Amino acid sequence: MTTSMLNAKLLPTAPSAAVVVVRVVVVVGNAP
Protein backbone atom coordinates (compact mmCIF):
# COMPACT_ATOMS: atom_id res chain seq x y z
CA MET A 1 0.00 0.00 0.00
CA THR A 2 1.42 3.36 -1.00
CA THR A 3 1.34 6.47 1.17
CA SER A 4 -1.10 8.21 -1.18
CA MET A 5 -3.50 5.26 -0.96
CA LEU A 6 -3.17 5.22 2.80
CA ASN A 7 -3.84 8.96 3.02
CA ALA A 8 -6.83 8.63 0.69
CA LYS A 9 -8.34 6.07 3.06
CA LEU A 10 -7.42 7.86 6.30
CA LEU A 11 -8.41 11.43 5.45
CA PRO A 12 -12.17 10.74 5.06
CA THR A 13 -12.22 8.81 8.34
CA ALA A 14 -10.21 11.37 10.33
CA PRO A 15 -13.27 13.32 11.65
CA SER A 16 -15.10 10.20 12.79
CA ALA A 17 -11.90 8.83 14.31
CA ALA A 18 -11.49 12.08 16.25
CA VAL A 19 -15.04 11.73 17.57
CA VAL A 20 -14.28 8.18 18.72
CA VAL A 21 -11.12 9.35 20.48
CA VAL A 22 -13.00 12.13 22.24
CA ARG A 23 -15.70 9.70 23.39
CA VAL A 24 -13.11 7.25 24.70
CA VAL A 25 -11.34 10.03 26.62
CA VAL A 26 -14.64 11.17 28.15
CA VAL A 27 -15.61 7.62 29.15
CA VAL A 28 -12.19 6.93 30.66
CA GLY A 29 -12.25 10.28 32.45
CA ASN A 30 -15.65 9.49 33.98
CA ALA A 31 -14.78 5.88 34.85
CA PRO A 32 -13.30 6.59 38.32
UniProtKB/Swiss-Prot annotation:
Keyword Nucleotide-binding listed: no
* Top-level taxon of origin: Bacteria
Asked if the Swiss-Prot or TrEMBL record annotates the protein with the keyword Amino-acid biosynthesis, the reply is yes
Q: Name one GO biological process term.
A: L-valine biosynthetic process
Q: Which keywords accompany this UniProt record?
A: Amino-acid biosynthesis, Branched-chain amino acid biosynthesis, Leader peptide
Alphabetized Pfam families for the sequence: IlvB_leader (PF08049)
Q: What is the role of the protein in this entry? A: This protein is involved in control of the biosynthesis of isoleucine, leucine, and valine.
NCBIfam families per record: PRK10214.1 (NF007579)
Q: What is this protein called?
A: ilv operon leader peptide
The source organism is Escherichia coli (strain K12)
Q: Which gene encodes it?
A: ivbL
